[in-house]
From Swiss-Prot:
Cellular component GO terms, alphabetical: adherens junction; nucleus; P-body; transcription regulator complex
The organism's place on the tree of life at top rank: Eukaryota
CDD domains for this protein: LIM1_Ajuba_like, LIM2_Ajuba_like, LIM3_Ajuba_like
PROSITE patterns reported for this sequence: LIM_DOMAIN_1, LIM_DOMAIN_2
Record carries keyword Transcription regulation: yes
Name under which the protein is recorded: LIM domain-containing protein 1
InterPro entries named in the record: Ajuba-like, Ajuba-like_LIM1, Ajuba-like_LIM2, Ajuba-like_LIM3, Znf_LIM
Main location: cytoplasm
Protein family according to the UniProt entry: Belongs to the zyxin/ajuba family.
Described purpose of this protein according to its UniProt entry: Acts as a transcriptional corepressor for snai1 and snai2/slug and plays a role in regulating neural crest development.
Annotated localization: Cytoplasm; Nucleus
Species, as recorded: Xenopus laevis
Single GO term (MF): transcription corepressor activity
């Protein structure tokens, strides 16, 4: 039984821990920060998160065929922008390089012309780095290598690859190799690496070494993981004379679809955030990058603290007008965006550096972040409502307790005949017709007036006051007097189950009125006063032949019964020596031949009787 008790205790602890989750706006549940230092609760969270991660991974793998490839303009409904019809078909060439030179595991990008023009605020421009016209951006490959570049100015392709099985294979290859981003680390759990401006063979390229720029501030960033939370988009300004910003966003979920559209390059967005769980990784993701002409800007990048023990998905909302805001993160309570250190096209120095104002923003991610558990709520076991019988029993119990508390010190007289409740206190008691009532229960049946201390009439089981009885016709059914036989029109006296006029209720011996006086009756129901009753019906003493009456001032009669005879106490003596007999040893009675003797006289009487 001890084993079962321990299991029950552990289960109850687990349920109590789960009931401490606080509901958040997005439907998930967050853990109280005060419980983060509990080792048992941390172990429970770790096991629970591992199970939920497997389920989350299986669900995402099932949904990949549905979100991976669509034909024609199928993605226009998802992203709310239209794609132009395909004109020609052919391989995509970036700055003279075909897609075969990039490799099957690299990103395949396609141009796309948007209906809306990106609108960048002047405040955003002040915090972002400005690239020159023909700059190129270094992008990490899915395998974690650096060096594959995507030109930002010239896209000479006029044809787009139609969707085919090859596209599916490429997408699966990219999905399987998406973990290569883990090697592309820009920050670790202890401190940021040193970053120095690096001059590449091609000016304006941003390599992975630009994360080393965090050395200048030496900002600690614990438990920093990468979540890339945007989509890759390219704009083309050939359709209009207005300068158009070309935005480049690293995809948060790293899956690329090819569509049967020419002169359009785009990257579709799929759910692959499930690849970023496991050990705590360090990555920094760019919110949005602008390039293509001197007015293009690179927005501030940010590092998102993420606890891999609890896999979750940090989503960033996409602006419907393709605008972006630097310095803001899509996750609540995350550090503000910090601009990267990048070189301009001339390679003469960094176009923008990390501001000193941002050094205080990066703090311990454990203190800034609220952990989200991807679990369903565990409904607390609500108490079932009590049944009607239980509620009634509780009400009766409370009522009895209240009465006991209210009358614990009062005198208890008995139970009321009418309401069957206890009568406490002389001020609440009323006695009539040999029964006990509450003052509020003994009332007139017609007018409901209290009848305590007043004349009343009892007719056919009902009680009436004098006014209602005399002037309302109740006297027609009144009783007749048992002695005189007349109708009782005023007050009535009831005794022995009969009704009497008060003046007719008298002693049969002395004819004294017994209204309000103690009386008694004999076997023939004759009425006597107490004095006459004892004179006539009282037992007589066997010695003096006088009636044995009560002592003066009392109603009790004391007598001695011996040999079926009654004696006064004073008459109960030895007939020979006149010794008073009682229960004492020397005064005990020893009757012989109908005579009362003491012990000595009894022996003498026996000796004389034997001699004779």
């Amino acid at each position: 039984m001890d084993t079962y008790d321990e299991l029950s205790l552990e289960a109850s602890k687990f349920i109590q821990d789960l009931t401490l989750y606080e509901a958040s706006k997005d439907g998930l549940f967050r853990v109280d920060k005060g419980l983060s230092n509990n080792p048992e609760f941390e172990e429970t969270k770790r096991i629970f998160a591992a199970k939920m991660a497997k389920i989350h991974l299986q669900n995402q793998q099932k949904s990949i065929p549905d979100t991976g490839i669509s034909e024609g303009n199928g993605l226009t409904h998802q992203y709310n922008y239209s794609l132009p019809k395909s004109v020609e078909e052919g391989p995509v060439i970036y700055n003279g390089l075909s897609n075969s030179s990039v490799g099957p595991s690299d990103y395949k990008t396609y141009r796309e012309s948007y209906k809306g023009k990106p609108d960048i605020d002047s405040a955003d421009r002040s915090e972002e780095s400005v690239f020159k016209h023909d700059s190129e951006i270094m992008l990490p490959s899915p395998l974690g290598k650096v060096g594959n570049t995507i030109p930002t100015q010239q896209f000479t392709s006029k044809k787009a690859i139609s969707p085919s099985i090859e596209s599916l294979e490429r997408e699966r290859t990219i999905k399987n190799n998406i973990t290569g981003f883990e090697n592309y680390r820009l920050c670790n759990s202890s401190s940021m690496k040193n970053c120095k401006p690096h001059q590449n063979s091609r000016h304006g390229e941003v390599e992975d070494t630009m994360a080393e720029n965090f050395t200048e501030n030496k900002t600690p960033f614990k438990q920093c993981s990468a979540l890339i939370s945007s989509s890759v988009t390219f704009g083309d300004d050939t359709h209009t004379n207005i300068p158009q910003k070309k935005l480049f966003n690293l995809p948060s979920t790293s899956s690329i679809n090819t569509q049967n559209n020419s002169d359009d390059v785009y990257l579709s967005k799929t759910n692959a955030a499930k690849e970023f769980h496991g050990e705590q990784r360090g990555l920094c993701s760019t919110n949005s990058l602008g390039f293509g002409n001197p007015n293009d800007v690179i927005s501030a990048s940010y590092c998102v603290g993420y606890n891999d023990n609890f896999p979750g998905e940090i989503k960033q909302k996409q602006s419907p007008h393709y605008t972006f805001h630097s310095g803001h993160s899509s996750v609540d309570e995350q550090p503000q965006a910090i601009p990267f250190c990048c070189k301009d096209s001339s390679g003469q120095g960094p176009a923008s550096t990390i501001d000193s104002d941002h050094t205080d923003i990066l703090q311990d991610s454990s203190a800034l972040m609220k952990i989200k558990l991807p679990c369903q709520t565990l409904s607390q076991s609500s108490k079932q409502g009590s049944s009607k019988a239980e509620k009634k029993l509780e009400a009766i119990t409370r009522h009895v307790e209240q009465e006991m508390d209210a009358h614990n010190k009062a005198d208890y007289f008995g139970t009321c005949v009418k309401c069957s409740k206890g009568v406490y206190g002389a001020s609440q008691a009323c006695q009539a017709m040999g029964n006990l009532y509450h003052n509020g229960c003994f009332i007139c049946s017609a007018c409901s007036r209290k009848l305590r201390g007043k004349a009343f009439y009892f007719v056919n089981g009902k009680v009436y006051c004098e006014e209602d009885f005399l002037y309302s016709g109740f006297h027609q059914s009144a009783d007749r007097c048992f002695v005189c036989g007349h109708w009782i029109m005023d007050m009535i006296l009831q005794a022995l189950g009969k009704s009497f006029h008060p003046g007719c209720f008298r002693c049969v011996v002395c004819n004294e009125c017994l209204d309000g006086v103690p009386f008694t009756v004999d076997m023939e129901n004759k009425i006597y006063c107490v004095k006459d009753y004892h004179k006539i019906l009282a037992p007589k003493c066997a010695v003096c032949s006088l009636p044995i009456l009560p002592s003066e001032g009392t109603d009790e009669t004391i007598r001695v019964v011996s040999m079926d005879k009654d004696y006064h106490i004073d008459c109960y003596r030895c007939e020979c020596c006149a010794l008073e007999l009682n229960n004492e040893d020397d005064h005990r009675c020893y009757p012989l031949d109908g005579h009362l003797f003491c012990h000595n006289c009894h022996l003498k009487y026996l000796e004389n009787h034997n001699l004779s």
